[in-house]
Amino acid sequence: MKHEHLNLLAAMSLALAGMPMAAWAQPGTGKSVATAGIDTAEASRVTQTVDSRVTSTLQRTHLAIVDKATATKAVDDASPMNHMNLILQRSAKRQAALDALIAAQHDPSSSKFRQWLTPEQFGEAFGVTDADIAAVSAWLKSQGFTVNGVYANKMQIDFSGNAGQVRQAFHTQMNHYTINSASHVANASDISVPRALQSVVVGVAGLNDVRPQAQHTKPTYGRFNAGTQRFEVPQPKVAAMAPTPQAVNFTNGARGLVPYDMAKMYGTDKLYANGLTGAGITIALVEDNSMVPGDWSNFVSQFGLTSYGGTFTQLQPQATGFTNCIDPTIAAPGEDDFEALLDAEWSTAMAPGANIWLASCSDSNANNFFGGVFTAATNLINGTNRPNIISASYGYGEGFSDAASKTAIDLMWAQADAEGISVFVSSGDSGSNPSFNGFIINGVGVDANAFGTSPNDTVVGGTDTADILDGTTKKYFSSTFNAVYGSALSYVPEIPWNQSCGNEVAAKSLGYATSLAFCKAYLNFDPNGYYITSEAGSGGPSSVDAKPAWQRLVHNAAKDQSRDVPDVALFGGSYGGSTWVIVCSYYYPCTPGFTGPTALIGGTSLSSPMFAGIQALIDQGLAAKGLPASQGNAAPTLYALAMDEYGGSKGNPPATLAACNADNGAKGTGKCVFHNVTRGSIATQCVQQLPNVVTPDCYFYGALPNSWLGPIQVGLTTTNASKYNASTEAYAARPGWSFASGLGSVDANNLLTAWKAFVNVQ
């Protein structure tokens, strides 16, 4: 069932109508300006004797995918299960009060505008009562668990035990399963709790280890050719087996974009010239791995960013009274995690003066759904030292999450929003289902990133530069690098990032009338299915969270009741591997002139930290005008500004809808806040392995009896499996908002100007 969120963008007037002391959440600091006048007083909801013999089942507290898998064996009762989180349920009264407060915090006309909470104030007003927490904690201890502590938000109890205790207390068996060819641990059925506790407990986050994937492409390594100003990238061995129709002329190699290029494309160069670099703003990147700090220094030096004064800190965040974040130590100097590298280097690329925190916790210390990433994020949000901005480049579809894990994510981002933290999340890297990064959609239908479908974060999708497929590279890029290896001349037209034959722009560039015709022809070139892919920016509707009011009001907003993603998009990758960004790593350092092999990479794991960097520039610009630097969730303001530029959900759109079309490039878009991406789609290939796998939301156009996956049917993702066209493909770009690219990309300089006007400062 969808949770009804009342996050009305109030600025749009029509829309606003018995444990150790250290283990407990810290005491509240009293009423703040934000909570003044809000009635959240309530009595304990645990009013009956807690009897473990009288239980109630909590729905959706096991993974649905487990029902399709066969258990290989039971988990041994003595197997430890550390740092599980019991997720609590706030009352309807407090939920409504929180929704109203967050709306007011984003309303420039409200006395509560930008009046942010501390974690303690949040817990005092919107958490579960101390009496109810004591009742739940006492029951956990009676079952033999160790209660490690209660978070300041009074919504999470961290506890540890073993599989036998979980079976006995929650009436579910922990098993080993093989899911998507990987070994996992998960509970076999929904859990049960004493009926007396049912009203205050959602479930347990930590009963499975199906964790999300980092949303980046596999790194490619190229050698720089000074003659072509491109990187020569080795072709896969399978390419020699048959010619591929993806062989578009990519001008003798791959292009490696650098910070200068992104600054030109997205207008941050103008902000740098005015002294706005992100100085004084902190961006936290939540990770489950680490990197070599010297690689960040290498990146900053290579691309001329040192003088801006940004800083880099690698840390393990701990909430007050907790020690559950363990350092994911690098075993050897060269064992960089490319997710960490990409996030750290490219958030700095956009905000070269910002303070970058790489906040990482090891997965090995927790069984919970999002492992170290979840621990890092929730510890930051409940900690003493909090960032202005968080970027999370991880994801999995909602179909791969359980109710407790999804609720934990949503309450975490709502708390961040109420505290003023802006959260950005990658949409995913596999088209209409974000769970297949680096693989092919198989056995499931349309889905959305569970880590991003909260209405309290901003989801960032992926785009591709259109110049190569359009044959307009000379118009937008210089033929030679400048001193910092940049070549972009201006904004470059964008299309959705899509590396499959479902890319209509690529199909037409290759002479096909439609992507479907291209895909059918493709089968003749690829009888073994080596080039079948679902790699693309992701987007789709939530099956859990309801659409917030601010998302309904922009032109072409989906006419559904779901929280839809993405919200915005920035460069993520390229068709045919023609364009990537450069990262500097221990084994592949960046050298003057790129004399050695260089790492090239992409994904929405690039897009999210880049937008976080842009937000840092916005924050600094607003702080310079006397406003709080922290802005909370960016999405409500972004949609309000988009409504001005694209028009509302009713009536004729303004002339700026056409004027701000990304296809116009730099011509006529100089005053636009958004670049509206209107060509292409994120519809990708999907497969159905015969005879046992059923893949919904897939229009099948052919079969490969001898593919490397065995006999398969091959199709394109769609919202109607019986037909495939511009209306049914999942999903097409279009004017206004779309599942393919949200509101599009931004001009950061114009965004700051419009944001200032929105909050009534000059």
Feature annotation, model-predicted:
Residues 612-620:
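Short glycine/serine- and small hydrophobic-enriched flexible loop segments
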Residues 436, 453-527:
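Polar, glycine-rich mid-to-C-terminal structural blocks
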Residues 26-150, 158, 163-460, 509-510, ...:
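Substrate-binding/charge-relay-adjacent region of secreted/lumenal peptidase catalytic domains
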Residues 1-25:
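Gram-negative bacterial Sec-dependent N-terminal signal peptides
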Residues 71, 489, 619-733:
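An often Trp-containing, charged/polar helix-loop segment at the C-terminal end
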Residues 323, 499, 517, 582, ...:
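Extracellular secreted precursors and ectodomains with disulfide-bonded cysteine-rich loops/domains
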